[in-house]
Regions:
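Flexible, glycine-rich beta-alpha linker
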Residues: 1-17
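C-terminal substrate-binding subdomain of Rossmann-fold SDR/epimerase-dehydratase oxidoreductases
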Residues: 5, 9, 24-144
Length: 144
C-alpha cells in the first residue's frame, strides 16, 4: 500500500505537512506561507478514506499484488487549499509567497486504478468535508 497525503483530526500541529501548517497559521492569525506561485498541485486523502482502504486490503485475498496507491485522484492547487482554509477558519491571514524549493514537484497525484479494481475502493470524502473536522480538531487544540 502506497499512501498519498493523508490528513484529518489528530495530526500533529508541527508535523510539517501543508494541511496542518495552513490550518495552524490561519487559526493563529499568522501569514500563511505559500511556496512558489501556489499553482503546484497535490491530492489529499481524508483519514477515514485511508482507513476504509486499509480494512478492505486486509480483508482481500492474499494473492493481491501491489503496490496499490491509496489517495485522492482529485487535485488541488496550494493556492486553492490556502484559500479554503482561510475561508473555513474565518481567518484574516494573508498569503505570503516565498521561493519554491528546487526539488518541489509541480504535481503529485496518485493513480488509484488498482485500488478501484482490486479493492472496490475510492475516496468518498471531499476536501472541504474533510477539512471541517480537521479544522475543528485544531481549533480545540490551539484555541482551547
Amino acid at each position: 500500500m502506497r499512501i498519498f497525503n493523508t490528513y484529518g483530526p489528530r495530526m500533529h500541529p508541527n508535523d510539517g505537512r501543508v494541511v496542518s501548517n495552513f490550518i495552524v497559521q490561519a487559526l493563529r492569525g499568522q501569514d500563511i506561507t505559500m511556496f512558489g506561485d501556489g499553482q503546484q498541485t497535490r491530492s489529499f486523502c481524508f483519514v477515514d478514506d485511508l482507513i476504509e482502504a486499509m480494512v478492505r486490503m486486509m480483508a482481500t485475498d492474499a494473492s493481491l499484488t501491489g503496490p496499490i496507491n491509496i489517495g485522492n485522484p482529485g487535485e488541488c492547487s496550494m493556492l486553492q487549499l490556502a484559500e479554503a482554509v482561510v475561508r473555513l477558519t474565518g481567518s484574516r491571514s494573508k498569503l505570503v509567497f516565498k521561493p519554491l524549493p528546487s526539488d518541489d514537484p509541480k504535481q503529485r497525484c496518485p493513480d488509484i486504478s488498482m485500488a478501484q479494481a482490486q479493492l472496490g475502493w475510492q475516496p468518498q470524502v471531499s476536501l472541504e468535508d474533510g477539512l471541517a473536522p480537521t479544522i475543528a480538531y485544531f481549533r480545540r487544540l490551539i484555541l482551547g
